[in-house]
């Protein structure tokens, strides 16, 4: 089964991806992991990517596509895979299709922006230990203080509301159009497209995702 998950930052894609890969015995293909592995192994594409990254530039779509093509030819992808973090744009989706990479299911985990902001902006961290809290879902015993040390908790830059809204804006401009793209492909019979509400318990969302893939 070849699956791709779509959803905004904070929609719970990562949690569901982990479950699906275990459930179906398929690897999660993450572009970040692939790049790091290719650089570490010193493959030709990895060396090319390293030069670009060392210069502080973004790795081109053509290199990422080359890595994906190599990765899905590996034996552990014989029964399928789950794509993570690619494609992010319609140009990338078209390039993936031209490469001959077909998908069986595209699942959108839909959560509205205000819920995402509430989820992410409520996170607090104890820097020394890495312990995490949430002001609503997992609050510390004393507001703003770590349970074990009593030291102050901090809000990471990534979890500040303005940062989250910027990330959501980028998602809506670049990646959200893929929902219509794959919905249109599904109408032509090319792939099955499903939208699953990403609210409720992790288990309820998992069951809804599984039901959509049945």
Swiss-Prot record:
Q: Per the record's keyword annotation, is Protein biosynthesis included, yes or no? A: no
Give the E.C. number(s): 2.7.4.3
Cite a single GO BP annotation: AMP salvage
Give the binding site residues for ATP: 10-15, 123, 132-133, 200
Question: Which domain of life, per UniProt?
Answer: Bacteria
**Family membership noted in the UniProt record:** Belongs to the adenylate kinase family.
Q: What is this protein called?
A: Adenylate kinase
Q: Which organism is it from?
A: Methylococcus capsulatus (strain ATCC 33009 / NCIMB 11132 / Bath)
Gene name, per UniProt, is: adk
